[in-house]
């Protein structure tokens, strides 16, 4: 979902800046496409101009054994859809096909773009430093037979282009250690060099060192690309009314993304930390019983079954425990003073945009790297646990969580001031003459020349 929203917002940005462009978004239609995705796409169709179209590809799941096979299976459908688009627009007055923008995990679609004789651009939803990291890991894997699993088991450090500090083995991202995900990640990364450029959801002021370290492929840091208008306030009145009653910057918001959940034992430690900290809190709590491959956890039907006995009564007046949360609306609210987060890149960009400090608690994907970058490299976050993995069985104890929350909520900290300053820079990057504004100009010129 996060990739789709960022891609659509990028499409809108391109259309607003270049009136000769039209964009068609092709969406995989498989069993893990949730009602939230369909509702989001429907809302975009209703509000978008005819220059932005959405097409669901045919549902075809026969013989799919991995994510890579899912992508390969879609190639004929993508080709057929693009052929129909170009045939429909084959008159002299109609726009020509100028290129493909493909998701960072869908580089197999470069083959389809090549068949049409047009360039491809990678849409990269993580940060520039992580792209540098992946290119470096791919290089030393291919040239030196680097094994990230062995590196993770050591106390070693890795020198990565784009990072000022040495990268510690303990922060090796979960995705790199996964036998399921590492091979396709490597293959995708190898293919980035075949693209004409990489569009990155970041901005120069946030990742200047990483961006300046790039040589190839060409990059376009055009972010932060966020959907901050559809903030969910109107459909989540109870949550927003509760926040309205809280003092400014007083609430700790705990939210771990669409796939973030904890065991009952870990939930009890978090509850203990929140109670002991004494801070007001809004906690988005998802059921740990994962439904299956790539599916998001659901909300608890009864919170009493997972929370400590008497917890809700003892914290009455300063707490609100919820299921799914309208994260953008909560971060935008003046009562929110800090975010305890899984360190997903979209969440990091949203917290920076609204000037809300983060306490890192990474869980999966590249989030351990993001946590290292935010805490050590950029000094924009505090650490609860930088090397946590949701499949490790580790339990982070109450006192460690409480320390992180107390540090997060310090109102006069230098870190909070740095986040506020970076918030202003994130907004300035998108304004006329700003860094991302200029990079987007360069991208458009490259596309339509």
Swiss-Prot record:
The keyword Glycosyltransferase applies. Pathway: Pigment biosynthesis; anthocyanin biosynthesis. One of its GO terms (molecular function) is anthocyanidin 3-O-glucosyltransferase activity. It comes from the Eukaryota. Keywords: Glycosyltransferase, Transferase. Its EC number is 2.4.1.115. This is Anthocyanidin 3-O-glucosyltransferase 1. The lineage of its organism: Eukaryota, Viridiplantae, Streptophyta, Embryophyta, Tracheophyta.
